[in-house]
Amino acid sequence: MSIESWTAPVASTPVQANVTIPGSKSQTNRALMLAALAAAQGQGTSTIGGALRSRDTELMISALRTLGLHVDEAGSVLTVNGRITPGEDAQVDCGLAGTVLRFVPPLAALSANPVTFDGDEQARARPITPLLDALRGLGVPVDGVGLPFQVQGSGSVAGGTVAIDASASSQFVSGLLLCAASFTQGVTVQHTGSPVPSAPHIAMTVMMLRQAGVQVDDSVGNRWQVRPGTVAARHWVVEPDLTNAVAFLAAAAVSGGTVRITGWPKTSVQPADNILNILFRLNVVVNQTDSFLEVQGSTVYDGFDVDLRDVGELTPSVAALAALATPGSVSQLHGIAHLRGHETDRLAALSTEINRLGGDCQETSDGLIITATPLRPGVWRAYADHRMAMAGAIVGLRVSGVEVDDIGATHKTLPQFPQLWANMLKRSTG
């Protein structure tokens, strides 16, 4: 993937735009996993409509094909069938995709052949050891404690009860739950340690498992029990990626304009309520119907205090908004210590880049304190992180001369980002 330097366009007038956001990465990759499990159980072919096509989802598709499954595209619909039959020397490239890194190893454990996992250099710093230890606890031999590692499948997994510290990533829990119904005894996952971040993503996993006919008991806090059984083949419909939509909604707040996201679901498996709670802190007017969400901004909003533990992936966009608040106002972002293990150390990256442009951003043990100050032109580094690149675009709406050093990082979850962003601003000025 090439590095593309990009001059962030300025919103010289209030943004007025309707934007259609492609499908959710989180939902797409969970649907692919459940479709693969249904096929592997002999339940038949699944289809996925509205699937996101991005680097992360292509890596997931490639991983499933490496395991012997068939993933085909007919128009805008993905079709998944086949069996788990990896060849000798099978190797899964995780890239920088946490969902591939943490969802596919339990699936590979159902293979009768060993499967090796590796990824981008930055991926080698991402937490994975707790998941590998959990697989070992369920009777799966695993060579290695981090990338690269090898899962020594035997064709089946006994399952049982396992304790895991998922305080670094909720994906540890989701990865086990997705495959648990295919394990002989099912799985009971007990989280130990500090609160699990991004809990809505576990809720998404549980909801989608139930939609596939899997019995999940999550009635006890920090414990999830999945009974052994079939995973139904079905047609999945993927929602627009609401997390990616936040950057575009931020444009309304920053410019005093109006942005409408078409296709915003009235009810969602994504953390829509968390997103709305953040938007309301920005002195905006929100209008939601069955078919869209519209935000009207006022250009002026004060700093805010927000716990982002459940939606840590929004932190770069929220930090950019905090940096553009009323000068002198202070924002506190907390509950996000786990972001140090994301695509990059997002707390350090945000502090560095905001301060590079003349801002005032301080790291705390679990977040950031940002005092809004006038920013100056300069290079905003993306660190190969899609969320960091989008944050630079938000800053550039208000600050002329912001150069995002790698807008291509957005290919991870939204390859169309530069064009969608340019079109949004073009419609506003044209």
UniProtKB/Swiss-Prot annotation:
* Keyword match Ribosomal protein: no
Record Gene3D superfamilies: Enolpyruvate transferase domain (3.65.10.10)
Q: What is its main location?
A: cytoplasm
The organism encoding this protein is Mycobacterium leprae (strain TN)
Q: Which gene encodes it?
A: aroA
Subcellular location per the Swiss-Prot or TrEMBL entry: Cytoplasm
Q: Name one GO biological process term.
A: chorismate biosynthetic process
Q: So what EC number does this one have?
A: 2.5.1.19
The record's family statement is: Belongs to the EPSP synthase family.
Concerning Pfam families, the annotation shows: EPSP_synthase
List the active-site residues: 313
Question: Could you state a single Gene Ontology molecular function term?
Answer: 3-phosphoshikimate 1-carboxyvinyltransferase activity
Would you tell me the Gene Ontology cellular component terms?
cytoplasm
Can you state which reaction this protein catalyses?
A: 3-phosphoshikimate + phosphoenolpyruvate = 5-O-(1-carboxyvinyl)-3-phosphoshikimate + phosphate
Subunit-structure text = Monomer.
NCBIfam families given in the database record: aroA (TIGR01356)
State the function annotated in the UniProt record: Catalyzes the transfer of the enolpyruvyl moiety of phosphoenolpyruvate (PEP) to the 5-hydroxyl of shikimate-3-phosphate (S3P) to produce enolpyruvyl shikimate-3-phosphate and inorganic phosphate.
Pathway(s) it belongs to = Metabolic intermediate biosynthesis; chorismate biosynthesis; chorismate from D-erythrose 4-phosphate and phosphoenolpyruvate: step 6/7
Q: Which InterPro entries match?
A: Enolpyruvate_Tfrase_dom, Enolpyruvate_Tfrase_sf, EPSP_synthase, EPSP_synthase_CS, RNA3'P_cycl/enolpyr_Trfase_a/b
Q: Which HAMAP family match?
A: EPSP_synth
Q: Where does phosphoenolpyruvate bind?
A: 25, 98, 126, 171, 346, 387, 412
Protein name (database record): 3-phosphoshikimate 1-carboxyvinyltransferase
Keyword annotations from UniProtKB, A to Z? Amino-acid biosynthesis, Aromatic amino acid biosynthesis, Cytoplasm, Transferase
The residues that the entry says bind 3-phosphoshikimate are: 25-26, 30, 169-171, 198, 313, 342
Q: What are the coiled-coil residue ranges?
A: none
